[in-house]
A protein has these predicted regions:
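Flexible, acidic/Gly-rich N-terminal and inter-domain linker regions that tether
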Residues: 1-69
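Short, charged beta->alpha transition segments
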Residues: 62-64, 93-104, 314
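Canonical Radical SAM [4Fe-4S] cluster-binding loop centered on the CxxxCxxC motif
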Residues: 64-93
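Short Fe-S-cluster ligation motifs
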Residues: 100-114
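Conserved AdoMet/S-adenosylmethionine-binding subsite of the radical SAM
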Residues: 119-241, 245, 249-398
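Low-complexity, acidic/Ser/Thr- and charged residue-rich accessory regions of DNA metabolism proteins
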Residues: 368, 472-486
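Long, highly charged, low-complexity intrinsically disordered interaction regions
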Residues: 374-445, 480-486
Length: 486
């Protein structure tokens, strides 16, 4: 027997899961939290194995929008206010029910929750916080949760979501501020970067107070430390007030009537200036390093009343830590005229200044058939998206920098060669590499040698010299590496 309420819920699920398919969530949880007796869910299993649909969606997560209603009119978005599409919204209880029922049936390993803007950023974010609270506290859901932070929402609501979610993300949307103004005039770079900074500062505090429970570091951070590079984020630590820590750990009390106007001082968070021009509207390409250092990443005044310090230590369960799986973001590629060089420079700045775990790249799809947007004769730029992901991997794990891979004179990747091979062919003076003498960082720059195989080479050399057969056994892709090693 099918009840009418169940039928309506399934219709909502069909609409809101389809509306969420353009949000990228294909990543492991990054959380080492086992199952707990009396609770439901295991965040570790979520990080072990994911299944992906043909279009790249992560199907092991229940990936839905809370609502596809939206007050904004972004030209690239299927859910923009001017579109005539079926509209619906979940309630917090419905999201909890779907998540728990799908998890019990082993259909999913966690929840990915994003949303359009219903009435206002604060109103929408409060509904999301209510949903996360009920999942964690009422239903004792211990699985993985990835939650989107709504740009423009109050600092208190963003922090509250961070105590319940494993990962949070704020979509950058487009690489440059000029592109954002052109295609998403209702959004601002300030409203996007403000919660990013808040989450980054909160994670740093959580790590300091809770150790590893406060969250693990990003791959980019570890790579930078290995190479002896300084991370700009470490220059801006915030020390929490000791009076906020300790005492009784009160259960969350649902906050009502906490909506704030867009002019509320809560939005004016303290933001330090940066050293990269690439997030400014007037960016014309990377110039000299000295000139870049004098350019702010975002022009924001310092406000004495604003603070990124965590304030809810005694109001929530802090055992999970604050956003322990880190934060990520997503950029649409190909909707505006940015070069690959500009895009990778933006990503590099985000890794350095906001401690991001991942930057996701989404090939532009003209879902609205907007004639003013770039024509897609050959379909979405999927190969370009793939090259950006490969280059992003080189930044995070291999120690490359954006200005090594590309330049103003050569601002786009070679579509026929992966970025690492392309770089090697442009730097033949560094090759061939003596496989039995080269250090770990040098080995990483050899095409065909990855992070694991480079480590195996270093360890295997302690037992004797290596030949090509040994390298093949280790896992080196010889058909690429053979031209660059000796």
């Amino acid at each position: 027997m099918v009840f009418e309420s169940d039928t309506n819920l399934m219709k909502k699920l069909q609409i809101l899961s389809d509306a969420a398919k353009y949000d990228v969530a294909c990543t492991s949880s990054g959380v080492q939290r086992d199952g707990i007796k009396g609770e439901i869910g295991n965040a570790m299993s979520c990080g072990i194995c994911h299944s992906f649909a043909a279009d790249g969606r992560c199907v092991s997560l229940l990936k839905i929008l809370f609502t596809n209603e939206c007050i904004y009119n972004c030209r690239y978005c299927i859910n923009r206010v001017s579109n005539d599409v079926p509209r619906t919204s979940f309630t917090p209880e419905e999201v909890c029910r779907l998540t728990m029922e799908f998890y019990r049936r082993n259909y999913i390993e966690g929840l990915f929750l994003s949303s359009g803007i219903l009435y206002s950023p604060d109103y929408t974010m409060e509904l999301i916080c209510k949903t996360l609270h009920d999942l964690r506290v009422v239903h004792h859901f211990n699985g993985y949760i990835h939650c989107k932070a709504i740009p423009g929402a109050s600092q208190e609501l963003v922090e509250l979501a961070g105590w319940y979610a494993d990962r949070m993300s704020v979509n950058l949307e487009l690489p440059t501020e000029a592109g954002l103004k052109e295609l998403a005039p209702n959004k601002s770079r300030k409203n996007i970067l403000t919660p990013m900074r808040q989450i980054q500062s909160g994670m740093a505090q959580s790590r300091e107070m809770l150790g590893m429970k406060g969250g693990n570091r990003s791959a980019y951070w570890y790579t930078s430390k290995r190479l002896g590079r300084s991370m700009e984020i470490e220059e801006h630590k915030i020390t929490p007030d000791s009076s906020l820590i300790g005492g009784r750990n009160d259960r969350f009390e649902e906050q009502k009537n906490i909506h704030k106007s867009s002019n509320d001082k809560t939005y004016n968070l303290s933001m330090d200036t940066g050293k990269n021009a690439i997030l400014n509207a007037d960016f014309k390409g990377r110039k000299s390093e000295k000139q870049i250092e004098k350019t702010d990443i975002l022009s924001m005044e310092e406000h004495k009343t604003g603070s990124n310090a965590l304030t809810m230590w005694n109001k929530t369960d802090i055992s999970r830590g604050f956003v322990p799986a880190g934060q990520s973001t997503q950029m649409i590629i190909g909707a505006t005229g940015e070069s690959d060089y500009e895009i990778m420079s933006v990503s590099e700045a985000l890794y350095k200044r906001f401690d991001l775990k991942r930057v996701f790249y989404s090939a532009f799809i003209n879902v609205n058939n907007d004639s003013t947007l770039p024509a897609q004769v050959g379909g979405p730029p999927l190969r370009r998206e793939h090259r950006l992901y490969q280059a992003d991997w080189l930044l995070r794990y291999y120690g490359f920098e954006a200005n090594e891979l590309l330049s103003e004179k050569r601002p786009f990747f070679n579509t026929f060669l992966d970025p690492k091979c392309d770089w090697a062919l442009g730097h033949l003076e560094d090759f061939p590499v003596e496989i039995n003498k080269a250090d770990y960082n040098t080995l990483l720059r050899v095409p065909g040698i990855g992070v694991k195989s480079a480590g195996r080479i270093v360890r295997a050399r302690k037992s004797g010299s290596l030949d090509f057969n040994s390298l093949k056994t280790i896992g080196v892709v010889l058909k690429r590496a053979v031209f660059f090693i000796t």
